[in-house]
Amino acid sequence: MATLRVDEIHKILRERIEQYNRKVGIENIGRVVQVGDGIARIIGLGEIMSGELVEFAEGTRGIALNLESKNVGIVLMGDGLMIQEGSFVKATGRIAQIPVSEAYLGRVINALAKPIDGKGEIIASESRLIESAAPSIISRRSVYEPLQTGLIAIDSMIPIGRGQRELIIGDRQTGKTAVATDTILNQKGQNVICVYVAIGQRASSVAQVVTTFHEEGAMEYTIVVAEMADSPATLQYLAPYTGAALAEYFMYRERHTLIIYDDLSKQAQAYRQMSLLLRRPPGREAYPGDVFYLHSRLLERAAKLNSLLGEGSMTALPIVETQSGDVSAYIPTNVISITDGQIFLSADLFNAGIRPAINVGISVSRVGSAAQIKAMKQVAGKSKLELAQFAELQAFAQFASALDKTSQNQLARGRRLRELLKQSQANPLPVEEQIATIYTGTRGYLDSLEIEQVNKFLDELRKHLKDTKPQFQEIISSSKTFTEQAEILLKEAIQEQLERFSLQQ
């Protein structure tokens, strides 16, 4: 019979006791009672916060949105196909946040800031909360710097300033995305960081936008956040906040940023889906009661910061889709009331070949001429009024048998003004060329031309002005004023081009 070696056992026990590392941690644990349709109901998790991240046993993450007396409603940040009833869930003690850094420029990412462009991982040392508080009133200053879109109709009559929120609204297939992407293309060389957020779009549409950015060299200063139509509702709901967090990172580093939300109608629909599955009471159009807060807390993050915070800015261009031109629906009226103006895109104008199809009469910018350079104010001051009078006269002329000479001249001038506002896609114009174009139309130099000739003449005029009168561009860009010398140079160029054009015909 073997004898017990007491001293050896004693030695082993002593070593084990010395090696024992006492770790006591309290974890907030719950159990899944129901899962499906992107929603999980959990019992337990007694100390959880609203909006806190949770982690399921198989690795999926979720956000706590409904805190009820008997259970917690979690929205899943993934398909959750492997989550089983009865499995454990752990609260992380953290609110949703994403990594942020300069390395995100030129990349395509999802709502969790993970790259989806196949170009490898993104290294980031800092992080920001996906939902952070908007700058206070004291932290802001009024909008005073223009953000040029490159579109004559907008920059001359519905100007957008850095730090403004301007809604782009219209039916489907009226060119809303084209207006937004052209604005991004026009920021090349302007030291503006752009963030394009695609919510619930077709993957082919997003790929087309990214290809355009690459071809035009815009990806160097742009981040694309994309959640496609087949993404979970939770990620479509989060995508705009992720984009805003990235834009804020640059804004608080004294940079100017532009963010496009394409489009907020899809985000509202994703939020409605989540809310109905969480059994929240539905309101108007089955949206939950806090759908206004969904958009207001997002758009209020756009701001022009004061000098103490570095005068950075975040300009937001949210897009909202209407059904058959109904701007009195719930989501359009909500976003109109939050933003500092709106650009209406009309299906009738689009089908009539007027592109961008901007209805200048009912579009408005509440910042107004504060967001224009002096030269643009001098030249384009009355153009919106002239176009409004033309539209009124045109409606009257349909029923009038004979018009007096003054009315006929006004109609002819209005048609030419409307023609000069036409621009092809991905062809934004610098502000100096816009000023030359508007001056030519409003001063009557186009009256002698046929309407079909207007755009050809203007293209040639802009090229002629650039080649033979480079001083014109220098005067406008340096002084921001339409001086007498600039006017003389422009008049000379117009006269020369009119003579050349008449000889060509």
Swiss-Prot record:
Q: Give the membrane topology, semicolon-separated if more than one.
A: Peripheral membrane protein
Q: In which broad location class does this protein mainly occur, judging by the first location in its UniProt entry?
A: plastid
Could you tell me where this protein is found in the cell? Plastid, Chloroplast thylakoid membrane
Binding residue positions for ATP:
170-177
Among SUPFAM superfamilies, the record links this protein to: C-terminal domain of alpha and beta subunits of F1 ATP synthase, N-terminal domain of alpha and beta subunits of F1 ATP synthase, P-loop containing nucleoside triphosphate hydrolases
Q: What class of enzyme is it?
A: translocase
Family matches, as PROSITE patterns:
ATPASE_ALPHA_BETA (PS00152)
- Which InterPro entries does its entry note? ATP_synth_asu-like_sf, ATP_synth_asu_C, ATP_synth_asu_C_sf, ATP_synth_F1_a_nt-bd_dom, ATP_synth_F1_asu, ATPase_a/bsu_AS, ATPase_F1/V1/A1_a/bsu_N, ATPase_F1/V1/A1_a/bsu_N_sf
Keyword ATP-binding on this protein? yes
The protein's annotated catalytic reaction(s) are: ATP + H2O + 4 H(+)(in) = ADP + phosphate + 5 H(+)(out)
- Tell me a Gene Ontology molecular-function term this record carries: proton-transporting ATP synthase activity, rotational mechanism
* An example Gene Ontology CC term for this record: proton-transporting ATP synthase complex
Subunit structure, interactors included? F-type ATPases have 2 components, CF(1) - the catalytic core - and CF(0) - the membrane proton channel. CF(1) has five subunits: alpha(3), beta(3), gamma(1), delta(1), epsilon(1). CF(0) has four main subunits: a, b, b' and c.
Protein family membership: Belongs to the ATPase alpha/beta chains family.
Name listed for the protein in its UniProt record:
ATP synthase subunit alpha, chloroplastic
State the organism of origin: Agrostis stolonifera
